[in-house]
Amino acid sequence: MSETSLLPRAHGAAVLSAAMRSTPDDFQVDELPAFEPSGEGEHLLLTVRKRGQNTAYIAKKLAHWAGIAEMGVSYAGLKDRHAVTTQRFSVHLPRRIAPDIAALDDTQMQVVESSWHNRKLQRGALHGNRFVLTLRQVQGERDAIEQRLQAIAARGIPNWFGEQRFGRDGGNVAAALAMFGHVQADDGTLLPAPTSRRRLRHDQRSMLLSAARSALFNRVLGARVAQGSWDGALEGEAWMLDGSRSVFGPEPWSEALAERLARFDIHPSGPLWGAGQLRSTDQAAAVEQGALSDPPSIALRQGLEAAGLKQERRALRLRPHGLEYQWLEPQTLQLAFALPPGCYATAVLWELGDVADAGRFNVDVRADA
């Protein structure tokens, strides 16, 4: 059973079933850049349109093309393999002499734009991502589907971490527990994990820490959805500013806060677990602690704290920007919308219903980053 298969739906029962990614063209993602190139400097920014390949493969190909070490190629985020995606890469060329860019173009990738910049591309340096998703074999009443889409556009959705974060059948969370010295029995109890001499690479360890953190966040968000407060206010709420990681509060409920919440200027937040005190207090903190009071959650919390991670926050609510839809055929529905960095298109699909994803296990860990 996966970490996301039993998540509650905020807008009610599923209104459709469908299939996605029978071809890469059914899942298109375009990065929304956070800045314009300076036109000078020793970092060549390449906007690459790729098909059927993951980000790491393209980065390695660019390094080989430029004759530099792979660490000289940077990107803002990982993108799906089983998709058609557009994203920026930076290639460090101190002499400002680039090989023939046209030599990069093939059936897997095309360079659609290039420019020089005065610094390398940093992870997370993007405004967001624009998605165009095509759902096929759609089953469900058209009126109900369209009403659900309108509700999503108006009210937003829970800001779940998507299934890509957790690996096949949620295996990354079990692996994180094992890394912390535990194994979960079928009845939910914890047992000591067998001693392993295998050392994890840094990237593997980071992936498991992220999976553990994400699972705990989803459990808190699940509790808020179940009580109907995922897009509202509890006493002791820690608020997150829309479009940023800035957090403020808790503070007394006021008309001003209510207005900001209604216009999506602020969102309630949940914990990205680590060492330190929860930012929330009172009722909000009680919900968070209660949702994470079972033995596996406690073990994950303790493991994250011991690993040196610090308490952070993530918005509980997400609003897709510019949500549009059109019926290409009676059973083919195309969706288009933009999401902030670190948010998952699969969270939008979950509020619609059950979508079978042919590319489900051919994606990067941060497929929607």
Curated annotation (Swiss-Prot):
Catalysed transformations (reactions): uridine(13) in tRNA = pseudouridine(13) in tRNA
GO-annotated cellular components: cytosol
EC number, UniProt record: 5.4.99.27
Primary enzyme class: isomerase
TRUD domain mapped to chain residues: 156-318
Active site: residue positions: 80
UniProt keyword annotations, A-Z: Isomerase, tRNA processing
Biological process, per Gene Ontology: tRNA pseudouridine synthesis
GO molecular function annotation: RNA binding; tRNA pseudouridine(13) synthase activity
SUPFAM superfamilies associated with the record: Pseudouridine synthase
UniProt-listed Pfam families: TruD
Cystine connections: none
Biological function: Responsible for synthesis of pseudouridine from uracil-13 in transfer RNAs.
Protein family according to the UniProt entry: Belongs to the pseudouridine synthase TruD family.
Protein name: tRNA pseudouridine synthase D
Species of the source: Xanthomonas axonopodis pv. citri (strain 306)
Encoding gene, per UniProt annotation: truD
